[in-house]
């Protein structure tokens, strides 16, 4: 067909003086900032910051989402709606999480436990629920998690995104709220469904507007001083979300395309997406190929051990 009209569906207003990279409003929703460039209002939602640039709280209409971090800046806890999620790491790699309802917050051994296994490239390829039920990740060619398949070769969770990573559709037939328990979504980033933000380590990304919530940390700015001059310090992946990714919120890189020979499950995932769900048989091939390698990884350094601890 022929392009006849351009539909304008988003409106941004920027500062005309001072820090001109800062948005003042998006579709009528206000932004305000502190002296360090952290938004205290993000699309009309109040944010609370601590220790300079750590996001501590998001105040939504139904309640708050609170975050806690360790001394290295890794997020170790999220509390939302009475539920507390505690994150565990093997070095800088997320090895697992434990989610507890409010009534079980102080009780050891009670909660939902999730462990993760990674492939040789550092990509999540298996999720183990409560130490006994395994699910395998499906990917598209750009490395986005498009779903999870169970050990019976059934696709039980599906995700869809727009080009900026906003989750546009979620289907969950797992019966255990797996789509909510799984943190990895677009580009394998850790997703917070309560806020719609992605936690990229050093800062958060907002796919609704296609920008980071706040600017790079001082270390990144100093290291990349020549490269960042004249750049918008809030922009995500140089405004190229299809071909680039930013794993830690520091500096983007070109996306490594998924090759059939490097991950069987990724190939099955891409075909599952392209065939609108008829790739279940291909997912079965992926599961069969992975089961043998997963058995040896559980309990080892790839997963780490999740234990109750006092933070």
What are these regions (language model features)?
Residues 10-12, 29-31, 46-47, 62-64, ...:
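A short acidic/small-residue loop/turn micro-motif
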Residues 1-6, 15-25, 33-41, 49-58, ...:
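A short glycine-rich beta-turn/N-cap micro-motif
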Residues 11-13, 30-32, 46-48, 64-68, ...:
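Short, surface-exposed charged micro-motifs
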